[in-house]
Amino acid sequence: SYSNSFSMAKSIISLLVGCAIEDGYIKSLDQHVGDFLPEFAEGNKAKITVRHLLTMSSGLSWDEAYSSLFSTTTQAYYGKFLRKLVLDQNVVTDPGKEFNYLSGDTQLLSLVLAQATGKTVSDYMSEKIWSRIGAEHYALWSLDRKDGIEKAYCCFNTNARDYARIGQLVLNMGRWNGEQIVPEEYLAETLQPTTYLADKDLGGIPTERYGHQWWFTNHRGHQVIFARGILGQYIFIVPELN
């Protein structure tokens, strides 16, 4: 049966960014978002790069609060104009300084992907990953409205077995049945904590728990890489235990 990924979708978007770099649609992680989105071509927004979005260090004003009826995230879930909502955000902290978990950063990545590739995020996902990993079922991505855009920060829908295939793909460093689907070099960087960023929620200590849209922890001496959704959705990867 289908299950909503919630924020595990963020980790999927990260994989697609790697594919887009390999395909030449995005020049590098340090390419500016304003190259793709004119709303980010001037002022402080012009400083923001693809890397800043991947590492949740954009410095944007997005209010992530889930318990508020009026937060930006609530508007994203229930509103019908997600593109405008995310493009209207302002810079409140210098980009590239602080890890601050913002769903808007991932949504912006999806807009970059769509603009860069000329394809919907769903179509690009189907082409680059889903059709190549032996997925047993179709996947669905919720839209903000009929004929709208994907809620890329959340709301990818498939079954547990096919979510596990995503985990296996990452464990294999982007390879599936001998084919390199996501660039290994990209994943090697993606799966490293961004210790050069101050962790806002942990008092400014170096960020050990997050990379490029993937989480990290340790369990019984083993490194654990994981995608996480707010309502208990997880893809766990423990490389040392295969």
Sequence positions of predicted segments:
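Active-site Gly/Thr loop motif
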Residues: 136-137, 188-241
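Active-site SXXK
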Residues: 1-29, 53, 109-113, 163-169
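Structural recognition of the beta-strand scaffold that forms the well-ordered cores
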Residues: 52-55, 100, 137-141, 155, ...
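Solvent-exposed loop and edge beta-strand segments that line ligand/cofactor-binding
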Residues: 42, 94-101, 149-157, 227-231
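A conserved catalytic-loop motif detector
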Residues: 168, 176-195
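Non-transmembrane alpha-helical segments in soluble domains
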Residues: 18, 34, 51-54, 87, ...
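Active-site-proximal alpha-helical segments within enzyme catalytic domains
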Residues: 105-112, 152-175, 233-242
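Active-site helix/loop module of the DD-peptidase/beta-lactamase fold
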Residues: 4, 23-61, 88-90, 116-153, ...
